[in-house]
């Protein structure tokens, strides 16, 4: 899948950004001032005054600004997104192009029909499995060794220190020390 350019993203996000109530006048003014002050090659003083003209409606000024940036090029669109992130971060995270990018990243990683989440069972299922594993480990650890009941358990536990952290492996190795001669 090809990368989506910032200009393409701005074309996709323009209807969302210009809809009523998305950006306040103060946020638009801050974005314009940032583009004008830090990047005067993007917005000259004359352009900044035009886009901050209070006689025009906010929607018209924003449409003009976005059109100007789309015509200016990729770097200008990228700086607009940076200014939008700084001055309107909650809105930046809701942009349609960001959702499209996140969904495309997930589909590239997935086999196609699986979801992006690791598990949808929740924390109760995790705690249940953790409790079950801890209970079984405690049962094996505390029960007196009876070779007739669990003949292969000590062999399995003998290989688990390779996988488990060194702090836990000390306890497993101490458990195995009395029966290593039987391997």
UniProtKB/Swiss-Prot annotation:
Q: Which residues form the CARD domain?
A: 8-99
Q: Keyword Transmembrane helix: yes or no?
A: yes
Write the record's keywords in alphabetical order, separated by commas. Answer: Disulfide bond, Endoplasmic reticulum, Membrane, Mitochondrion, Transmembrane, Transmembrane helix
User: Could you state one GO cellular component term attached to this entry?
Assistant: mitochondrial membrane
Keyword field contains Membrane:
yes
What are the transmembrane regions?
Answer: 122-142
Intrachain S-S bonds = 7-77
Organism superkingdom: Eukaryota
Its localization reads: Endoplasmic reticulum membrane; Mitochondrion membrane
Primary role: Plays a role in inhibiting the effects of BCL10-induced activation of NF-kappa-B. May inhibit the phosphorylation of BCL10 in a CARD-dependent manner.
Q: Which proteins does it associate with, and in what oligomeric form?
A: Associates with BCL10 by CARD-CARD interaction.
The name this protein goes by in its record: Caspase recruitment domain-containing protein 19
Q: Which organism is it from?
A: Bos taurus (Bovine)
Gene name, Swiss-Prot/TrEMBL:
CARD19
């Amino acid at each position: 899948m090809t990368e989506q350019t910032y200009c393409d993203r701005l074309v996709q996000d323009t209807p969302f950004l210009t809809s009523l109530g998305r950006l306040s006048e103060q946020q638009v003014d801050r974005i314009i001032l940032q583009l004008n002050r830090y990047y005067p090659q993007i917005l000259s003083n004359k352009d900044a005054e035009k886009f901050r003209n209070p006689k025009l409606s906010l929607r018209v000024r924003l449409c003009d600004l976005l059109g100007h940036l789309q015509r200016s090029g990729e770097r200008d669109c990228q700086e607009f997104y940076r200014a939008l992130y700084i001055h309107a971060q909650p809105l930046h995270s809701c942009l349609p192009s960001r959702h499209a990018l996140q969904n495309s990243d997930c589909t590239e990683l997935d086999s196609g029909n699986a979801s992006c989440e690791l598990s949808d069972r929740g924390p109760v299922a995790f705690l249940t499995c953790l409790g079950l594993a801890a209970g079984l480990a405690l049962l094996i650890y505390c029960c007196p060794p009876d070779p007739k009941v669990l003949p292969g358990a000590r062999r399995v536990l003998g290989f688990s220190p390779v996988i488990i952290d060194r702090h836990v492996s000390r306890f497993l190795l101490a458990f195995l020390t009395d029966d290593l001669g039987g391997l």
